Amino acid sequence: MFHEPVASPRNRRPSSWVGLIVGLGCGLPMAAAGPAIERIMPPGGPRGAEVEVEFRGRDLDEAREVVFEEAPIAVTALQQVDPRTVKATLRIPADCPLGGHRLRIRTADGLSELRTFRVAGFTQTREAEPNNDRAAAQAVTMPTTVVGVVTGEDVDCYKVRLPAGGRIAAAVEAIRLDQEMFDPHLELVDDKGFVVAACDDHPLLAQDGMLAAVAPAEGDYFVRVRESAFGGNDGCVYLLHLGDFPVPHLAWPPAGRPGTAVEVTWLGDPAGPFRQPVTLPATVPLAGVAEIVPVRDGVAAAVPVPIRLSPLQRCDEAEPDDEPAKATRVAAPAGILARMDAAEDVDWFRVEAPKGTTWNVRAWARQLGSPIDVVVNVHRDDDKRERITGNDDSDGPDSAVRVTVPDQGSFLV
């Protein structure tokens, strides 16, 4: 939870400017629609490889270049197939950061909207239809990343051989590819058709799924991917990562100062927590979050875990703090690190700041992979403890409020 001062009123543009801009805009002719990317196939590639990628969309004629915002991915060839299709050969360095990399296509008419290209650490396998049931399942060798498509009522089935006690991890990227409203369902079944593990939604991956399981006996196991409501179409593209990689979804501490070295404990893997020394990036991304790849026993996770970057002074929750009289004292501005360790847990903080100043109080939980849905309430720091304001969800399950410090020079959160 981070407390940040609100900009001075002198730095805010008057609201009347907004009305003026809107009024002028109504009299201007509509600009022509720019280029748009609707599908990227494949939507990702492995480190250290060259990948031919097809971009399909609208008004992509006279394409000049594929522009990556930050990734060190080189475009070695560009081919205009037709006004709606562009092919590019991408060279991905062996040390390219894992995860999503934002790109646009620049044409003679301008830039497309942002899309994402995913970089994985495994070799890539293309789906081979038909693979709709266990009898026709496509055999794959782990570790690998499968590129597939779920069409209407389609179920894609992949077969792996596991020894007794062998571990398998699977993670699917679908909704996060931002190509289609594709809500995938992921499950692992044994050779008799019994479900060993399943995941529909995940606290770190939103509507995408991730799971890990240990084989109770030697045999063939099947990973199935489908649309959660058995829908699908040609745009429901996915990346399925298969291997024995770790699957944590939360870091502790979940935040740190840019450029500092921290000992991170990764949480959420069924095999238990594990530790890893991490040096946080010195440069803070626009979103204020660094994507860090957990590594256990030399094996990297397929999915990075976000860690909040902030220059604010760190303040650790001091339990017990489940009532106002025991509230943790915080001198604003600060970044508060806290945990909900039990059901019905309530944490109280006494925030001290000059009276009359205005502060943002923002919770970071689900954005960092935590499964909790935070509720934030702000109260006066007096005997009555009158509620000043509060929030449950703000642009997602995490909470955010703005509060002006009362005369007491403090308030309770």
Q: Where are the model-predicted features located?
A:
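Extreme N-terminus of proteins, especially the signal/transit-peptide cleavage junction
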Residues: 12, 30-33
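Acidic, Ser/Thr/Pro-rich low-complexity intrinsically disordered segments
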Residues: 33-85, 94, 98, 108, ...
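Bacterial N-terminal signal peptides
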Residues: 17-29
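Predominantly extracellular/luminal regions of secreted and cell-surface proteins
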Residues: 115-142, 298-334
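Hydrophobic or amphipathic alpha-helical targeting/insertion segments
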Residues: 100-104, 112-117
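N-terminal secretory signal peptides that target proteins for export/translocation
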Residues: 1-14
